[in-house]
A protein has these predicted regions:
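Extracellular beta-solenoid/beta-roll
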Residues: 334-336, 353-458
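Extracellular beta-strand/beta-solenoid scaffold signature
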Residues: 65-67, 88-95, 116-129, 147-155, ...
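Bacterial Sec-dependent N-terminal signal peptides
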Residues: 1-15
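N-terminal segments that cap or nucleate solenoid repeat domains
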Residues: 52-120, 449-457
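C-terminal motif of bacterial Sec signal peptides marking the signal peptidase cleavage site
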Residues: 23-27
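All-beta strand scaffolds that present successive hydrophobic residues in beta-strands
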Residues: 73-82, 100-105, 135-140, 161-167, ...
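Post-signal-peptide, soluble extracytosolic/periplasmic N-terminal scaffold domains
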Residues: 97-105, 110-149, 154-173, 180-193, ...
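Disordered, low-complexity segments in secreted/periplasmic proteins that are enriched in proline
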Residues: 28-67, 290-293, 349, 463-483
Length: 483
């Protein structure tokens, strides 16, 4: 059965990499596989009794993560007592459909392809699939997929929960995420190692209908185009983990959704280009693509502690949406030649109103790098609790509206002439460093205090395409909504 290349997959790749700038348009590849009807599962053993070896493996995993860190797992680290395989297009290897199921110490191999939206939205062709309010507890697993639209572990629908720990996941096909959550499902993960190599294959991924994702510990790596480590149309929290992308952004947040990173080490090397919609690369992209997969509204990106290392381009890029960026004690290193923050129009939304509206809250934070806010964008920058900002804002002249508020004990050192709209600061908090600062066209006098007014942020609200509850018998995904 020849795999089809879906509109959704191509749009997904474009969304993840177009604004981020990346070199020739790439879509999911076609291939052939054995045919079969969708929806059946091939689990040979749904629960197992711990053996001595299994207990030792569990103990080692616990010890490895006791100090808040976790071991980078390989296949050989996990004791395997059972193997489950499925090569049929559209089918699953393990399914929990409205039931509670426990699976451990199992190798899961999934090949076969899917045509697209049914896999991305509703879980078709996933190796492991939970739906209809089912609960699936997984531990000490090895999960490998090799097919187009072959996600590894999928939680779909309100009331559905997947808990997975101390496991190794690998996907090698295009449009094949590691952890996938849609339709309001819940995914809880601890101490995983996930490697994805296909295009449009985020390690931690959500899609239409979103949900809640909690990840603690582990190593999550992507190497394909349009494959950030995290792609969020949900509320995703990651703590004490290592995230690495070698071709795409590190994090993408779309629409009215959020990503929170607690003590996370994130490295992003966005060095590939799929479209001419933008000429920028970045580590973190926050946007609204207007595909309907994410509701419109204010998003957020929060980073508490940890490190963010950007290898190429800008650190943050915000387009066609309003967002809060909250940074608290994070070490941010920009090793490329880009800037710290760019709020600007790109290829999505209505021309003239598709910029970025950013509220940047810096708490005990060091910010090093320039900021650019184009004429259809705006920025409210708050420097709090001893934060320092070294850089220029709109050094080429006045463009979008910018408000800067500097709390007592925080400072701004200019590295170039800067143009802002309004300023609140105590005396002595700004070091012009030989440059000029213009506030609404008036040159600021170094050493003086100022009182200004924040920019009002206008947030457009609308719902995305929701995913229907439930599913067909035997864990098949439901039909797509007629909208």
């Amino acid at each position: 059965m020849k795999a089809k290349v879906s509109r959704k997959c191509m749009v997904f790749i474009a969304i993840l990499s177009a604004i981020a700038t990346t070199v020739a348009f790439t879509s999911c590849s076609s291939g052939s596989s054995s045919s079969g009807s969708g929806g059946s599962s091939a689990v040979s053993q749904s629960s197992q009794t711990s053996t001595g070896d299994e207990a030792s493996s569990d103990k080692a995993a616990t010890e490895a993560s006791a100090d808040g860190s976790s071991k980078q797992l390989t296949e050989s680290d996990i004791t395997i007592n059972d193997t489950v395989e499925n090569s049929a297009d559209g089918e699953h290897a393990i399914t929990a459909d409205g039931e509670s199921k426990t699976v451990s110490n199992t190798l899961v191999n999934k090949t076969g392809d899917s045509s697209g939206d049914e896999a991305d939205f509703y879980g078709e062709n996933a190796a492991i699939f939970a739906t209809n309010g089912g609960t699936l507890d997984l531990s000490n697993m090895v999960v490998k997929t090799n097919g187009t639209h072959a996600n590894a572990v999928f939680s779909y629908g309100e009331g559905t929960t997947v808990n997975i720990s101390d496991s190794y996941i690998e996907t090698s096909g295009n449009c094949s995420g590691g952890l996938m959550t849609t339709g309001g499902g819940t995914m809880n993960a601890a101490n995983l190692t996930i490697n994805t190599s296909g295009n449009s294959s985020a390690a931690i991924r959500s899609d239409r209908g979103g949900g809640t994702v909690n990840v603690n510990g582990g190593y999550y790596t992507t190497s394909g185009k349009g494959s950030p480590v995290i792609y969020s149309t949900a509320d995703i929290t990651v703590s004490d983990a290592t995230l690495t992308s070698t071709a795409s952004q590190g994090v993408v947040v779309e629409g009215k959704n959020s990503v929170t990173l607690n003590n996370v080490d994130l490295t992003a090397d966005n060095n590939t280009k799929n479209s001419d919609k933008s000429s920028y690369y970045q580590a973190v992209m926050i946007n609204q693509s207007m595909s309907g997969d994410a509701a419109q509204g204010k998003s957020s990106f929060t980073m508490n502690g940890g490190t963010l290392t950007n290898k190429n381009g800008d650190v943050f890029f915000v387009n066609n949406t309003a967002t809060d960026i909250n940074l608290s004690g994070a070490q941010i290193k920009n090793e490329g030649d880009g800037i710290f923050l760019r709020a600007a129009a790109a290829g999505w939304g209505t021309e003239g109103s598709n910029g970025g509206q950013v509220t940047l809250n810096a708490t005990n934070q060091v910010i090093d790098g320039d900021m650019v806010v184009d004429k259809v964008s705006n920025l409210n920058l708050y420097l709090k609790s001893g934060s320092t900002f070294t850089g220029a804002i709109n050094s080429d002249g006045q463009a979008g509206e910018v408000y800067v508020e500097i709390e007592d004990g925080s400072t701004w050192t200019l590295t170039g002439d800067s143009y802002i709209t309004s300023l609140t600061c105590p005396a002595g908090s700004i070091n012009l460093n030989g440059h000029k600062l213009y506030v609404n066209g008036v040159e600021y006098k170094e050493g003086s205090a100022s009182t200004g007014t924040a920019i009002e942020v206008t947030v457009s609200e609308s719902s995305g395409h929701g995913a229907p509850d439930g599913g067909k018998p035997e864990g098949n995904p439901p039909a797509k909504p007629n909208n």
